[in-house]
Swiss-Prot record:
The gene is PEX29. This is Peroxisomal membrane protein PEX29. One of its GO terms (biological process) is ER-dependent peroxisome organization. Pfam families: Pex24p. Belongs to the PEX28-32 family. PEX29 subfamily. The keyword Transmembrane helix applies.
């Protein structure tokens, strides 16, 4: 029994187990999370994370206990049933969309202290709510009666009342609730307990009987389940649900045309227009409102709405709005507007490119008097690097070859890209503020310098590669006529050249960006060399062999 209850109660089992992190390539700038993942056989490709939507379940100590301090059998069964239903929902019912995952997580965190999903609680709460829905449905019936002109005199009276509210808003809005309480609640109740005498001259005698009360006062209570009011509330709830459904669908139909960036050009245009309107409204509406006679305008709009809601006028307007002619005119106007927007906003920002940095680490062995390769790491392993400060072995945080390095999460290597050896180590040493190192300008190695000024036992050099942002959805396609361009506001942050050669080739040098280069070959710290023009299979010896030979000679 203990193992069964642990299955239901221990919702965060093994959640605190430490995960194994992967090595990541360091990017040129720390502001962008673009570190490349470096993997080897003993390192997992991704760390395991606990499910963020899984909340902790209440412990048994928080449940009602029977005499003796232990939970009763009925409480245990109820707890297990509720937890089982919750777990089944989590496993079997996925989120409706990817954007809803965060919303679901926040809602689950907010509802952590609330009761779990239960059929009994749902049924009880629904019955309690339905027994108290009489007043809202009566108000809705009155509104429908007014707009349908069931009693024209009543509707005209409401129109005059609306006019009076517009003319004297503060007096009317502060007095109407009090008048309603006096003449719609208290007076009918007084007439009920002081029942008027019937008369043959009037249908309803409004003169209360004199003397003490003739009836007991009736205080409104929730209607019982077996009553006509309860059934009427249930029927009205069933029918009025469609009002919210239609309102929701109509609102979504309007917003999906521009608010969700289904077409970036159209949504960008509406965003700019709405931003300008909101800004002008915030800054100048108090001055602009003085130039408009608001009260006559509101009165005309209100009376026009009431007149348009008359059954005969409403039928004519709805027929006109839903006609094929109106639909074609609206479609023509919207199509012309969208075509003009697409014509002027056909330029889109180029796909993001980033430069990934990896350091090749070598260690000097005095007994052999030679440098032995250690591996490739995202850490430069200098004297003040994080690995050296925490006394971690570089062998455990590196891989043996560049081919084992993976791009950062949600990124992918650029097509036909190669690893490039950086031939200007002074630049990245200064950019990363690396201290106590010595730069060999001939071999391009950066050596450790001990505090006494002697060379240390480690050296490193930097390799770079370019990656592009991965498309998370395969169905994304660019619209016809769109042109990718580099954002001019970000162009200043790009470096104009990378000094390096590709792995396995001596063809290299200082490569610069030109007008003929593709716009998407811009990186965060410069233009990636045009690796398509570099012969990776050339017959020259590799740069690694050359630098090692020079170093041995020195």
């Amino acid at each position: 029994m203990d193992s069964v209850t642990n299955f239901f109660w221990n919702d965060t089992y093994n959640a605190g187990t430490p995960t194994r992190s992967t090595l990541k390539g360091k990017k040129v700038q720390n502001g962008i999370d673009g570190k490349s993942q470096a993997k080897k056989e003993s390192i997992s490709s991704g760390s395991r994370t606990s499910d963020p939507t899984r909340g902790s379940l209440p412990s048994s100590s928080g449940q009602p206990t029977s005499g003796g301090g232990f939970p009763s059998t009925s409480n245990i069964q109820k707890m297990m049933a509720d937890t089982l239903v919750e777990k089944i929902i989590k496993m079997a019912l996925p989120p409706s969309s990817k954007t809803a995952v965060d919303t679901i997580h926040h809602r689950m965190v907010a509802g952590k202290e609330r009761p779990k999903l239960s059929v009994q609680i749902t049924s009880r709460n629904f019955i309690q709510m339905n027994s108290r829905l009489g007043v809202p449905f009566m108000i809705m019936d009155e509104l429908i009666k007014i707009l349908n002109w069931t009693n024209p005199a009543y509707t005209v009276s409401i129109m005059f009342l609306y006019t009076l509210i517009i003319l004297k808003p503060f007096q009317m809005l502060s007095s109407l609730p009090i008048f309603y309480l006096l003449f719609c609640v208290m007076v009918p109740q007084y007439l009920y307990i002081h029942k008027p005498n019937p008369t043959s001259y009037l249908d309803n005698n409004q003169t209360p009987a004199q003397g003490p009360p003739l009836r007991r006062p009736e205080v409104p209570k929730p209607v019982p389940e077996l009553s006509q009011e309860f059934v009427l509330n249930l029927t009205d709830l069933q029918n009025h649900m469609l009002l919210y459904v239609k309102f929701y669908d109509f609102t979504l139909l309007i917003l999906q045309k521009f608010a969700f960036f289904t077409n970036e050009a159209i949504s960008s245009f509406y965003f700019i227009v709405l931003l300008i309107i909101a800004t002008l409204n915030f800054l100048y509406m108090d001055k602009f409102i003085k130039l408009i006679p608001m009260r006559p305008v509101l009165i005309l709009l209100g009376w026009g709405f009431f007149i348009a809601s008359h059954p005969s006028n409403r039928e004519y307007l709805l027929t006109k709005l839903n006609s094929e002619e109106t639909r074609l005119k609206t479609l023509t106007i919207s199509t012309n507007l969208e075509s003009k927007i697409l014509q002027h906003l056909k330029l889109i920002e180029a796909r993001e490119h980033r430069l990934v940095m990896i350091f090749e680490i070598q260690k000097y062995l005095p007994e052999y008097k030679e440098w032995r390769p250690v591996g490739f790491s995202d850490d430069d392993y200098s004297l003040f690097s994080s690995l050296r400060i925490y006394q971690r072995r570089i062998e455990e945080n590196s891989v043996k070859s560049l081919e084992e390095i993976e791009p950062p999460k949600d990124w992918e290597w650029e097509a036909n890209s190669h690893w490039v050896l950086d031939l200007d180590p002074k630049e990245w040493v200064e950019d990363e503020f690396i201290q106590y190192v010595e730069i060999d300008s001939e071999t391009k190695w950066v050596y450790d310098l001990n505090l006494d000024g002697q060379r240390g036992s480690y050296r490193r050099r930097m390799w770079t590669n370019s990656c592009v942002r991965k498309k998370l959805d395969s169905g994304i396609s660019s619209n016809l006529g769109e042109e990718e361009v580099v954002n001019p506001l970000r162009e200043e942050t790009y470096r104009q050249g990378v000094h390096g050669v590709t792995k396995g080739s001596m063809s290299g040098g200082l490569t610069h960006s030109s007008d003929d280069d593709r716009a998407d070959e811009e990186s965060i710290n410069g233009t990636i060399p045009n690796l398509n023009n570099i012969d990776a299979d050339a017959s020259y010896p590799s740069i690694e062999e050359l630098t090692d030979t020079l170093n041995s000679t020195i």
